[in-house]
C-alpha cells in the first residue's frame, strides 16, 4: 500500500494515537486531515508518555514528515505550546519534520469566546463542546469569513480581514450575549508574532503529499475523533464540526479518492463516549464503573470521565460501510480480562422491528433497545500476549464475532498502551 487511513470507528478515544504511532514505523509521511486541538492522543514509547493534540503522531519518529492538513483548524497558541511540550521531552520539531497547510483555517480568540458563550446559552441542551473554538472556526470557514494560515502570514491581508471580522464578532459578543468586546490591537500583535513563527512551516501540502504518493512513499492519514462524531453521519448534534470518516481525507488533505488503498478502523473491545447523546449499550451499573476504572477512561483533552458500555457491533458495521474499511484494529481487549460474561450488541429493537444500522434520528436512536449475544469471558491477563496464539480461546472467539458480523477482518490487536503490546494478525 502507499496511502492508508487510520480513523476512529466509534465515538472517539479508541486508541488512534497508539495505532498511528505503531503503523507510522513503516510510513514516510503522517497527515492529520481534520479536527483541531480538541483531539487527544496518548502514545507510550518505552517509559515515556506523550500527549498529542494537534501534531501528528509520526512526530515521535525521527525520519517521518508530519503534515497538518487544510481540513484542520489551527490554534497557533496551542500549536506552539505543544511544540514546546514535545521539545521539553526531547522531540525535535523543525520545518523539515513538520509542515502546515497554507489553506488551514486559524482559530482566533473570538472563536473560543463564542464557543463558551454559546454553550452556556444552551443551558441543559448543551452539546458538550471542549470550548476550544473548533465549531465557531469551522462556521466561519463555511460562511467564508475565516482567516486562513496564508492570510495570517501576509500582514496586510491579515490586518484587513481581522478588522472586518472582529467588528462583526464584537457586535455578536456584546449586543447578543452581553459579553466584553475583544481588543483589536491585542489580537493583532499576538497573532503577528505567531505568523512569523509559523512562516517556515507553511506549505501547499496537497502538492507535497500527492508527490510523495506518486513517488511510492508510504503515506498514513491520521483521523481524530470517530465515525459517530462525524458532522454528517454522527449522532447529530452531539458531534464534532468536521468530517471524521474516510471521505474527509480527500477534502482535508487535498488527495483524490483513488490514491487511498486501505482504511483501518480503530475500535475498542467495548464502547465509550464523552458528553451527551444516545448510547444504546451504556452500562449504568458497577460493571460500567469497573470498566471505566480498569480502562482509565478519562479524556486526554478534557479530563472528563467517559461513559462506558458493551461493544456495539451495529456501530462497527456502520463505520465499515461508511468508510469502506478494509480492516479493524481492536484495542483494550486486555481491559475486559476478569469479566465472567461479556455482551456484544448485534442489533437494535426499534418500534417492534429489528434493525442493524444506526438511525439518523436522535429520538429513534434513544429508543433503540440493544439486542445482545453473550460470550464467556477470560480470567487471564493478556498484557504479555505477543501473537494471536497467545490470546485465550474466548478472546479469539470474541474477535471472530467482530469479523463475522461486520464482514471486515481484524488485522491488529492491542493488549496495552505500549508499542510492543501490539500484534499484527494480518496485513492491513
UniProtKB/Swiss-Prot annotation:
UniProt EC number: 6.3.4.4
Known pathway: Purine metabolism; AMP biosynthesis via de novo pathway; AMP from IMP: step 1/2
Binding site for IMP: 13-16, 38-41, 130, 144, 225, 240, 304
Gene3D superfamilies in the record: Adenylosuccinate Synthetase, subunit A, domain 1, Adenylosuccinate Synthetase, subunit A, domain 2, Adenylosuccinate Synthetase, subunit A, domain 3
Example GO biological process: 'de novo' AMP biosynthetic process
Annotated catalytic residues: 13, 41
Cofactor(s) annotated in UniProt: Mg(2+)
Annotated keywords: Cytoplasm, GTP-binding, Ligase, Magnesium, Metal-binding, Nucleotide-binding, Purine biosynthesis
Coiled-coil annotated spans: none
Similarity comment text for this entry: Belongs to the adenylosuccinate synthetase family.
HAMAP family: Adenylosucc_synth
Name by which UniProt lists this protein: Adenylosuccinate synthetase
Organism: Clostridium botulinum (strain Langeland / NCTC 10281 / Type F)
Source organism phylogeny: Bacteria, Bacillati, Bacillota, Clostridia, Eubacteriales
GN (gene name): purA
